[in-house]
Swiss-Prot record:
Inhibited by N-methyl-D-glucamine. Inhibited by choline. Allosteric regulation of sodium ions binding by pH. Residues 97-102, 178-188, 239-292, 351-371, 435-436, 496-506 are extracellular. The lineage of its organism: Eukaryota, Metazoa, Chordata, Craniata, Vertebrata. Residues 1-76, 124-158, 210-217, 314-329, 393-413, 458-472 are cytoplasmic. Symporter that cotransports neutral amino acids and sodium ions from the extracellular to the intracellular side of the cell membrane. The transport is pH-sensitive, Li(+)-intolerant, electrogenic, driven by the Na(+) electrochemical gradient and cotransports of neutral amino acids and sodium ions with a stoichiometry of 1:1. May function in the transport of amino acids at the blood-brain barrier. May function in the transport of amino acids in the supply of maternal nutrients to the fetus through the placenta. It comes from Pan paniscus. The extracellular C-terminal domain controls the voltage dependence for amino acid transports activity. GO terms for cellular component: cytoplasm; plasma membrane. It comes from the Eukaryota. GO terms for biological process: alanine transport; amino acid import; amino acid transport; cellular response to arsenite(3-); L-glutamine import across plasma membrane; L-proline import across plasma membrane; L-serine import across plasma membrane; neutral amino acid transport. Disulfide bonds join C245-C281. InterPro entries: AA_transpt_TM. This is Sodium-coupled neutral amino acid symporter 2.
Length: 506
């Protein structure tokens, strides 16, 4: 039997779905036959039953926990929070500048609540479906098609996320090194070449961390990464009171004019608005323009963490669905506040002049400011330490798809990890710009992972609730909303390509 699939067992109502086995890498061998319930468990609600092996049926609950999770509650919060936060935080001020403060808060609230609701659906489906593997839930619900849909969505979304992180390394790290070494002419210097640097960082930092088998070890790097993002947020708030207005507008316009004279095609769309002294420092609460349509995909992608939910759940100490939902609520609320504050203070610093990447806007105003240089280092550290966490669900998906029935092998484990990292590096090095491709893949995959797959799995696998129940109707509405969001976002991106219009990045 696969590690994450077990027979049913009675537990108390306060501990629904407590204590699955922790075995993300399939290194244990178990009997393949599922046990039937004894009669004295027959009246227990299926949602409040647990899974165990046939050979241990009838034993007390504490005797069935052969491979309990080992990751603490706090470390799980760190891991999930780090899976949520990412490069999207750099684009949220741009999203607010193109939606207005009030509309942005409304969208951010709805997206965060919907994302948390989909985590609830996913955990409940995992309990009812008897599996802690995303792809296996897809297989149980819709056969091979469901398995491929889950695996493909996970892989697409995470490779897109990894690419965005490594693109930040590629373009920001050379600038940091150049500022630290005071080198004006970087021609021919390999250590100022972004392609070489992204390869070096991948080999020296990312690969060793990615080879860990247990996510708990990365909790420490997750905590450090989150501290880097908190530092970034603090600097964004402080700079709001240090950068005068409307002086920064004039500086941005001058920078734009200089860029236009040397590189006419390098115009930044966020700077193309007419600026008046009256409007340049006045916040807007509702804005609708050609760039507003990119706000929803940016926000959706910013909250995608669902491929990492089940692995984190599997390794949670004293795990139960209620305990994991508490982990999720804390993580989502913390990221909601971080996203809101970063977007708000970034927007109130530059207003409609904010660019699609917030750090670039600061560099246009303050140049080589020491504090901003430290922020760049912090962001680089954060995204670098996030990549190993993102690799885990990709490797799990590939392993389950290709080698589900095989025992764990370090050679296979390492080969899959190196292959994933190598493919992502090739994308970053050889694709001139991944923004449009990433936007299309991110919009489709993120909508699949947040809206469509969890609700579809829930409707199919949770048998104890009739289709006319409030829960099933809510899940169906959630599914239809996901289809609408996915098709709408993809259509708008295609229209953006057709009309060759500049778009916002994530």
């Amino acid at each position: 039997m696969k590690k994450a699939e077990m027979g049913r067992f009675n537990i108390s109502p306060d501990e629904d779905s407590s204590s699955y086995s922790s075995n993300s890498d399939f290194n244990y061998s178990y009997p393949t036959k599922q046990a039937a319930l004894k009669s004295h468990y027959a009246d227990v609600d299926p949602e409040n039953q647990n899974f165990l092996l046939e050979s241990n049926l009838g034993k007390k609950k504490y005797e069935t926990e052969f491979h309990p999770g080992t990751t603490s509650f706090g470390m799980s919060v760190f891991n999930l929070s780090n899976a949520i936060v990412g490069s999207g935080i750099l684009g949220l001020s741009y999203a607010m500048a193109n939606t207005g403060i009030a509309l942005f808060i409304i969208l951010l609230t709805f997206v965060s609540i919907f994302s948390l609701y989909s985590v609830h659906l996913l955990l409940k489906t995992a309990n009812e479906g008897g599996s802690l593997l995303y792809e296996q839930l897809g297989y149980k619900a819709f056969g091979l098609v469901g398995k491929l849909a889950a695996s493909g969505s996970i892989t697409m979304q995470n490779i897109g996320a990894m690419s965005s992180y490594l693109f930040i390394v590629k373009y920001e790290l050379p600038l940091v090194i150049q500022a630290l070494t005071n080198i004006e002419d970087k021609t021919g210097l390999w250590y100022l070449n972004g392609n070489y640097l992204v390869l070096l960082v991948s080999l020296v930092v990312i690969l060793p961390l990615s080879l860990f088998r247990n996510l708990g070890y990365l909790g420490y790097t997750s905590g450090l990464s989150l501290l880097c993002m908190v530092f970034f947020l603090i600097v964004v708030i402080c700079k709001k009171f240090q950068v005068p207005c409307p002086v920064e507008a004039a500086l941005i316009i001058n920078e734009t004019i200089n860029t236009t004279l040397t590189q006419p095609t390098a115009l930044v769309p966020a700077l193309s608005h007419n600026v008046t002294e009256n409007d340049s420092c006045r916040p807007h609460y509702f804005i609708f323009n050609s760039q507003t349509v990119y706000a929803v995909p940016i926000l959706i992608f910013s909250f995608v963490c669902h491929p990492a939910v089940l692995p984190i759940y599997e390794e949670l100490k004293d795990r139960s669905r209620r305990r994991m939902m508490n982990v999720s609520k804390i993580s989502f609320f913390a990221m909601f506040l971080m996203y809101l504050l970063a977007a708000l203070f970034g927007y109130l610093t530059f207003y409609e002049h904010v660019e699609s990447e917030l750090l670039h806007t600061y560099s246009s105003i303050l140049g080589t400011d020491i504090l901003l240089l430290i922020v760049r280092l912090a962001v680089l550290m954060a995204v670098t330490l996030t990549v190993p966490v993102v690799i885990f669900p990709i490797r799990s998906s590939v392993t389950h798809l290709l080698c589900a029935s095989k025992d764990f092998s370090w050679w296979r484990h390492s080969l899959i990890t190196v292959s994933i990292l190598a493919f992502t590096n090739l994308l970053v090095i050889f694709v001139p710009t991944i923004r449009d491709i990433f936007g299309f893949i991110g919009a489709s995959a993120a909508s699949m992972l947040i809206f469509i797959l969890p609700s579809a799995f829930y409707i199919k696998l949770v048998k104890k609730e009739p289709m006319k129940s409030v829960q099933k109707i809510g899940a169906l509405f959630f599914l239809l909303s996901g289809v609408l969001v996915m098709t709408g976002s993809m259509a708008l991106i295609v229209l953006d390509w057709v009309h060759n219009a500049p778009g916002g990045g994530h």
